[in-house]
């Protein structure tokens, strides 16, 4: 897959990829960098968190349909990360997806959304140790897409970048 080769060539080590069970359609992606002026970056430093681990599962018709993307660890609060590690981003839906998007671009958008949404590493006793589940993420994502299809997606003001 060309996407995998492109990521291997990145010079800034923004992300790194490992195949899950050598499956080209199932990736674990390590997000190594978020905005260094953000509270999330500060959380990462304080908790010795080197990266945010995500899972991307690609459909057979990728790049014409989006991958399913979810956070695996650490457990995050806010930042558009919902139950199960589901991610609330229109570009991850069939309606919002474009076959021109690259995994790198999606990951950069996700990193920006985490910061814009005031994402934080969960430090609440008990809750921070509970792992995200794929089943819960899929159900949450399906529900949020249904809600947004009914009520629309909020477009941030131009002043927000």
Swiss-Prot record:
<dbReference type="GO" id="GO:0005524">
    <property type="term" value="F:ATP binding"/>
</dbReference>
<dbReference type="Pfam" id="PF00179">
    <property type="entry name" value="UQ_con"/>
</dbReference>
<dbReference type="GO" id="GO:0061631">
    <property type="term" value="F:ubiquitin conjugating enzyme activity"/>
</dbReference>
<comment type="function">
    <text>Probable E2 ubiquitin-protein ligase that catalyzes the covalent attachment of ubiquitin to target proteins. May facilitate the monoubiquitination and degradation of MTOR and CCNE1 through interaction with FBXW7.</text>
</comment>
<protein>
    <recommendedName>
        <fullName>Ubiquitin-conjugating enzyme E2Q-like protein 1</fullName>
        <ecNumber>2.3.2.23</ecNumber>
    </recommendedName>
</protein>
<keyword id="KW-0539">Nucleus</keyword>
<dbReference type="InterPro" id="IPR016135">
    <property type="entry name" value="UBQ-conjugating_enzyme/RWD"/>
</dbReference>
<feature type="domain" description="UBC core">
    <location>
        <begin position="1"/>
        <end position="154"/>
    </location>
</feature>
<keyword id="KW-0808">Transferase</keyword>
<dbReference type="GO" id="GO:0016567">
    <property type="term" value="P:protein ubiquitination"/>
</dbReference>
<comment type="similarity">
    <text>Belongs to the ubiquitin-conjugating enzyme family.</text>
</comment>
<keyword id="KW-0547">Nucleotide-binding</keyword>
<dbReference type="GO" id="GO:0005634">
    <property type="term" value="C:nucleus"/>
</dbReference>
<comment type="pathway">
    <text>Protein modification; protein ubiquitination.</text>
</comment>
<keyword id="KW-0833">Ubl conjugation pathway</keyword>
<dbReference type="InterPro" id="IPR000608">
    <property type="entry name" value="UBQ-conjugat_E2_core"/>
</dbReference>
<feature type="active site" description="Glycyl thioester intermediate">
    <location>
        <position position="88"/>
    </location>
</feature>
<keyword id="KW-0067">ATP-binding</keyword>
<comment type="subunit">
    <text>Interacts with FBXW7.</text>
</comment>
């Amino acid at each position: 897959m060309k996407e995998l080769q492109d990521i291997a060539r990145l010079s800034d080590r923004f992300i790194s990829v490992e195949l899950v069970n050598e499956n080209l359609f199932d990736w674990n992606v390590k997000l190594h960098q978020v905005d260094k002026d953000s509270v999330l970056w500060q959380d990462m430093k304080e908790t010795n968190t080197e990266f945010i681990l995500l899972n991307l599962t690609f459909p057979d018709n990728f790049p014409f349909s989006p991958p399913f993307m979810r956070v695996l660890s650490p457990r995050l609060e806010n930042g558009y990360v919902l139950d199960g590690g589901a991610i609330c981003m229109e570009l991850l839906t069939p309606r919002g997806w474009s076959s021109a998007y690259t995994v790198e671009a999606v990951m950069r958008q996700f990193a920006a959304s985490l910061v814009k949404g005031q994402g934080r590493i969960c430090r609440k006793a008990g809750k921070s140790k509970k792992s995200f589940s794929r089943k819960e993420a899929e159900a949450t994502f399906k529900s949020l897409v249904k809600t947004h299809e009914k009520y629309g997606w909020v477009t941030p003001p131009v002043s927000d970048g």
